[in-house]
């Protein structure tokens, strides 16, 4: 008896939420009974959303007269801007879209990781080196590196051991993802839902569609923020909050232009 499984009619998940109904059983030829989730398609997001469809908000940039035909507003944060034609090929577009979402999420986590330790340290909470690009160097100190300043958690003394653990753990996860490992009841690898949505944020299709847009917006800002943190670390040797405090204390002498002029030849 074939399982009553409904396939999604669209390759995207933008503007839609998928709800899992109760499990249905399938009897295989060897007499075993397997269980799988039955997928039903929920009501799509309203077509009046300003973020989706042909009438969505657009930013075409200075070199584009109109949005290309392949950018239809089907996906979140599609503003119709693709002057270089990076999304013209559907397979490349799908890959780049996945990479952007992944990098957005990493950047948002990274930005928090750069700011919060310094914020805690400035408010009297000590847990080791607070400046993000200096924290890892503590492993070369005589006492090694204590995660969160607590030797009872992880006490690291070998950079090679840390590197090996990072390669094994992250490599295994990335390899599993790239190979398209079985995702169980997951419908969309970018927005898996189910156990990955304990707060039920995806239950309302319209709210979920808007949350996708907010995620990409904040993720793009986070990627720019991380780039700024990298440049600040190289130029000033300080953390983001210390740079901000210096700028607020003396904005005339502590700004991007004043630091840039330090690299002028002959100065």
Curated annotation (Swiss-Prot):
Location of the region described as Disordered in the Swiss-Prot/TrEMBL record: 21-47
Membrane spanning residue stretches: 101-121, 153-173, 221-241
Sequence positions bearing Phosphothreonine: 38
GO cellular component terms, A-Z: chloroplast thylakoid membrane; photosystem I; photosystem II
List of residues binding chlorophyll a 5: 214, 232
Binding of chlorophyll a 1, residues: 81, 87, 100, 220
InterPro entries with a match to the protein in the record: Chloro_AB-bd_pln, Chloroa_b-bind
Keyword Chloroplast: yes
Similarity comment: family membership: Belongs to the light-harvesting chlorophyll a/b-binding (LHC) protein family.
Protein function: The light-harvesting complex (LHC) functions as a light receptor, it captures and delivers excitation energy to photosystems with which it is closely associated.
Protein name as it appears in the record: Chlorophyll a-b binding protein 22R, chloroplastic
Organism of derivation: Petunia sp. (Petunia)
